[in-house]
Amino acid sequence: MAFNMDPKKCPMPTQDPNVRNKNFKEVALGYTEEMAVNEAKRCVHCKNKPCQTGCPVGIDIPEFIGHVAEGDFEAAYQVINRSSSLPAVCGRVCPQESQCEGKCTRGIKNEPVGIGRLERFVADWHRENVHTAPIVPEWNGHKVAIIGAGPAGLTAAGDLAKLGYKVTVYEALHVAGGVLMYGIPEFRLPKAIVQQEIDGLKKMGVDFECNMVIGKVLTIDELMGEYGYEAVFVGSGAGLPRFMGIPGESLKGVYSANEFLTRSNLMKAYLPTSKTPIRTGKKVAVVGGGNVAMDAARSALRLGAESVYIVYRRGMAELPARKEEVEHAEEEGIIFKTLCNPVEIHANDEGFVKSITCIEMELGEPDASGRRRPIEKKGSEFELEVDTVIMSLGTSPNPLIRSTTPGLETNKHGCIVTEGDEGKTSREGVYAGGDAVTGAATVIKAMGAGKAAAKAMDEYIQNK
C-alpha cells in the first residue's frame, strides 16, 4: 500500500459559517469514503504505536486506520468497538489534539493523522450501513447498578453487559445520556447519535430507570441492600455550577452555562411553546474560555443574539477550549474579549442585566496550573453593554450522593476519592469514575474511568 505523504490533513467539509450560525445542524459534515481512505494512508504505522498510548480507552489506532486505508470499514469498526462503546461520540467531541493526535509521529513535522475524523467516519459508516442485532451474552447470575447515564456510566454499563451482568442504570434526568444530551449542543453532537448508542445498550439487555435521583428516591445502601446489587458504579458527573461571587450575579438575565445549555439542548426552552422559557438577549457575554463557554456562546448566537462576547481573563493562546472550537466560534462571528475579567454586573430599573464592568488583566508568572497568572491592571475598568451574562466557570459534583452515603470519602472539592485507576472507593463494592471523581473533564477520560471501573467491579464480584 502506498503511503500518502501529504503534510496536511484532508480538510473536513463544514457548513458555511454565515449559514450555520443561524441553525443547529451539525457543523462538520464528515468525510466521504475517498477522503477517509486518503487520510488513512497518511498513517505510517509506527511499531511502538505512540497514538494508542494517548487514547484513554486504548483503541488500537494503527490497526483500525489500516483497515480504513484498505477500504474495509466494518473491520475498522470492529477494532474500535473492542475498546470504545461510543465511537461516533468520541470522533466528534474528544480533544484528539492533546491525546492520540498529540502523540502522532506525523505531527512532529507536519499535521498529525486525522484520527478523530477517521473514527467518526467509521462509526457513521457502520451506523448507516450495518443493521445487525448485538449479541446478548448469557446472564452470569450477578447484577450491578450504575448511577448516572453519562459517558462514564454508559461505558461501564456496556462493558459489564458484555460480561453477562444484569445492569440497571439510574438516571436523574428524564432522558439518558448525561452531558452528551444536556451539555453539548446539537451542532457539535447530534442527539440522534447519542440515542442510537443508548438504544444499542438497551438491545444488549441494559435497563434504564430515568427520573431516579439517587440520594433522594433511593440510596446506595438501599441499592446494595434490599435491591440486591452486588456492586454499584457512581458516574453522576459534575453538575453543580460555579460562580464568581461578584455583585449582580443574582440579577435576571444571568445564567450558569450549565442551566443555559441544559434548557436549550434538553428542554428546548427557546421555543415559544416552552413552559420554562429561556430569555436570550441581543447582547450576550459568556464568561470563561473552555469548550462549554464556546458551546454557550455559539448557542446564544443561533438563538438570535446580535452580538456575543467571550470574556476571558487570559489571552487567546491560553484558551483551554479546543483549537477547532475556537476557530469555529471566530468564523461564526463570536467576539473575543481576552485579558479582561468582570467585576460587577449592573441592572436596569426592572432588575434585568444592562451591562458589566470589566477590568483589564495582564499575565504574570505561571500559577499552580502551569499557566501564567492573570493580574488586574489598576484603574483599567471599562463597561460592556450586555443584557445577558452566562457564567462558564466550571462545575463541581452534586453533594447529594456523598451526603446520603455514610463512609464514602470525598475531597475538599466534593469529588469522590478513589484508589488508583480502578475507581474503588472507601465503601466496599462501590466504585466511581468520571467527573464525579475528577471534577469537570473530558468525555473520553470519563469513558476510560468507566471502562477501568467495570473491569475492577467484575474482578471484585468474581472473587467474592
Feature names for model-found ranges:
Residues 20-38, 59-92, 109-138, 264-265:
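Ferredoxin-type iron-sulfur electron-transfer modules in oxidoreductases and energy-metabolism complexes
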Residues 41-63, 85-108:
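Local cysteine-cluster metal-coordination motifs and their immediate loop/turn environment
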Residues 75, 138, 143-147, 195-246, ...:
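Feature captures the FAD/FMN-dependent oxidoreductase FAD-binding
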Residues 142-168, 293-301:
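N-terminal Rossmann-like FAD-binding beta1-loop-alpha1 element of flavoenzymes
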Residues 250-281, 366-440:
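FAD-site-proximal beta/loop scaffold in flavoenzymes
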Residues 436-462:
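A conserved FAD-binding loop/helix module that cradles the flavin
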